[in-house]
């Protein structure tokens, strides 16, 4: 069983705590992406990044001095977005790190796919960015089937906790033999169940923690998730979609 998760824009360098275990599997392709980005002007990159001048300047300077092989941070500690804050890997015990290293995969526009303990450096790049490298018209084409092939294992079970922007990288290549379960977090708004971005990100991180703490190998066990006010809605769920509703007090 593999769990897929989106990355986060906000990243840090932390070389004082855990050391990375290895380099990302597609580091050579990452080097190609880096070279392509370095060939662009500051204005071109600002358009790709869709950010203000200050953030563009910070990331342009990062690119100029980027080293893919030294001063690296384990991926699961490098990302600082909401999902990763609620996952709270900095307080994991060794058994949880070992579980995640085996089961969690972080999808990345820059690195392709990451194990939690792969060494990374801060970058800014989203999968839907207008980036054409070689014959590939965009990053979905650039990474192609590689990410799916890296995620699928003998169980053929994938738990999707990624956003649509990233899960698309996997869904295109699914086969009838695969069991792909998308997790939906929602709450009642008026008379409709809706997904609210911030709460969904919180829940994704919390669910990764729940799965790791309970050493889950069978997807059915995920239905027991009951944190942050969420509970499983069996009446709205199916074999390919688990729906969790947050009760608002």
Language-model-derived ranges and their functions:
Residues 88-239, 243-249:
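Internal, well-folded beta-alpha domain core
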